[in-house]
Curated annotation (Swiss-Prot):
Membrane topology recorded in Swiss-Prot or TrEMBL: Multi-pass membrane protein
Record's function text: Regulates membrane-cell wall junctions and localized cell wall deposition. Required for establishment of the Casparian strip membrane domain (CSD) and the subsequent formation of Casparian strips, a cell wall modification of the root endodermis that determines an apoplastic barrier between the intraorganismal apoplasm and the extraorganismal apoplasm and prevents lateral diffusion.
Segments in the Extracellular topological domain: 64-92, 147-178
GO cellular component, one term: Casparian strip
Cited InterPro entries: CASP/CASPL, CASP_dom, CASPL
UniProt subcellular location: Cell membrane
Family: Belongs to the Casparian strip membrane proteins (CASP) family.
Full protein name: Casparian strip membrane protein 2
Transmembrane helix listed as a keyword: yes
GO biological process: one example: cell wall modification
Main location: membrane
Transmembrane listed as a keyword: yes
Length: 204
């Protein structure tokens, strides 16, 4: 009977062995979580680098437009022919808007760093998605309105008798056109940033 009791105790040991296998399942889940975290961290690093590039594009657009000023070498007794960004309200709006876009991007860098350090955190990524979408709209509005005025400066409008001025004010038009191109580059960067935030949130 003692030998039989000894054989009865064997299933108890096997059940404890089965309990010992339970942590292996938890370890497998941890590997899955760490894999997702590594993917999101890679997206966060790319997000940070894109923000640096967008800062350069936005501030370059504001600075270039803000310094677009040209005075023709000839003048009359009563008139001096000059073209400047502050002569056009649309270009004034462009300078202010792009400066705000650049300032926002600088302030968003710490939040982007948080997403690198905590790749699985949802709140900072969601905050960036909402703010980036709003600033993207402002950036697009500034770039589009300035592009329309720049087109009129180059081509004019025969229906309204608006004459092109870029033949006379070549430097002014070149600077303003460069600023518009830089602003649209910033729009592309912002679009990618919004997509990155959406993908990262979907991975959660």
């Amino acid at each position: 009977m003692k030998n039989e009791s000894t054989f009865i105790d064997v299933p108890a040991e096997s059940s404890s062995a089965m309990k010992g296998k339970a942590p292996l399942i938890g370890v497998a889940r941890d590997h899955t979580t760490s894999g997702s975290g590594g993917y999101n961290r890679g997206l966060a690093i790319f997000d940070f680098l894109l923000r640096l590039a967008a800062i350069v594009a936005a501030l370059a657009a504001a600075a270039t437009m803000g310094t677009s000023d040209e005075t023709l070498p000839f003048f009359t007794q009563f008139l001096q022919f000059e073209a400047s960004y502050d002569d056009l309200p649309t270009f004034q709006f462009f300078v202010i808007a792009m400066a705000l876009v650049g300032g926002y991007l600088v302030l968003s860098l710490p939040i982007s760093v948080v997403t690198i350090l905590r790749p699985l955190a949802t709140a900072p990524r969601l905050l960036l998605l909402v703010l980036d979408t709003g600033v993207l709209a402002l950036n697009t509005a500034a770039a589009s309105s300035a592009a329309a005025i720049s087109y009129l400066a180059h081509s004019g409008n025969q229906n309204t008798n608006w004459l092109p001025i870029c033949q006379q004010f070549g430097d002014f038009c070149q600077k303003s056109s460069g600023a518009v191109v830089s602003a649209f580059v910033s729009v592309v960067f912002f679009t990618i940033l919004v997509v990155i935030s959406g993908v990262a949130l979907k991975r959660h």
